[in-house]
């Protein structure tokens, strides 16, 4: 790799580290090419990316970024998994590591917060942004649905509801 290619890689990685919500570092020694392709496909499906880069170049790219705390983890055959979703890369990496013991999670960073392997596993157990958005939409729609059900209910059901409230007030 010539000097300009190295400079381009460092620049690209620096941009990735600045834009990513989470970066996970893992050892991949012993993974087959098929395993790496499977990991890359799973990451891509989740909206995350896996990159294998020379540790010294990745270390240079980390300088001045929020995730610079992962620099000491860059020893040996390491891969970097990153995503804009704070949970996606961690979730895929942890799930893949459970199925394949050759992938060893070393740690990671979420913004300026350094994560140890247990922190990455805890992050992976959280719901993704899409899941949280779906829950919020469901919670917002629930009251509207209930109002629509009451408005559309037959008059007899409404009479029973009002009668029940009247009996409740008399009993109290």
From Swiss-Prot:
GO cellular component terms attached to this protein's record: large ribosomal subunit
Molecular function GO labels: large ribosomal subunit rRNA binding; structural constituent of ribosome
Domain of life: Bacteria
Coiled coil ranges: none
UniProtKB keywords: Ribonucleoprotein, Ribosomal protein, RNA-binding, rRNA-binding
GO BP of this protein: translation
Gene3D superfamilies named among the record's database cross-references: 3.30.70.1730, 6.10.250.290
Family to which this protein belongs: Belongs to the universal ribosomal protein uL10 family.
Function recorded in the entry: Forms part of the ribosomal stalk, playing a central role in the interaction of the ribosome with GTP-bound translation factors.
Assembly information from the UniProt record: Part of the ribosomal stalk of the 50S ribosomal subunit. The N-terminus interacts with L11 and the large rRNA to form the base of the stalk. The C-terminus forms an elongated spine to which L12 dimers bind in a sequential fashion forming a multimeric L10(L12)X complex.
Name of protein: Large ribosomal subunit protein uL10
Organism: Methylobacterium radiotolerans (strain ATCC 27329 / DSM 1819 / JCM 2831 / NBRC 15690 / NCIMB 10815 / 0-1)
Gene from which this protein is expressed: rplJ
């Amino acid at each position: 790799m010539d000097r300009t290619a190295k400079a381009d890689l460092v620049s690209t990685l620096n941009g990735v580290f600045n834009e990513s919500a989470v970066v996970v570092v893992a050892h991949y020694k012993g993974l087959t090419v098929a395993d790496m392709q499977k990991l890359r496909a799973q990451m891509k499906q989740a909206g995350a990316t896996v990159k294998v880069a020379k540790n010294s170049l990745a270390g240079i790219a980390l300088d001045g970024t929020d995730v610079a705390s992962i620099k000491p983890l860059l020893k040996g055959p390491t891969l970097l998994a990153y995503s804009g979703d704070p949970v996606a890369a961690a979730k895929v990496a942890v799930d893949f590591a459970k199925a394949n013991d050759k992938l060893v999670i070393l740690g990671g960073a979420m913004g300026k917060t350094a994560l140890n392997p247990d922190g990455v596993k805890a992050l992976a157990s959280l719901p993704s942004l899409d899941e949280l958005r779906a829950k919020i939409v469901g919670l917002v729609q629930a009251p509207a649905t209930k109002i629509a059900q009451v408005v559309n209910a037959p008059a007899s059901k409404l009479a029973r509801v009002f009668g029940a409230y009247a009996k409740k007030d008399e009993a109290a």
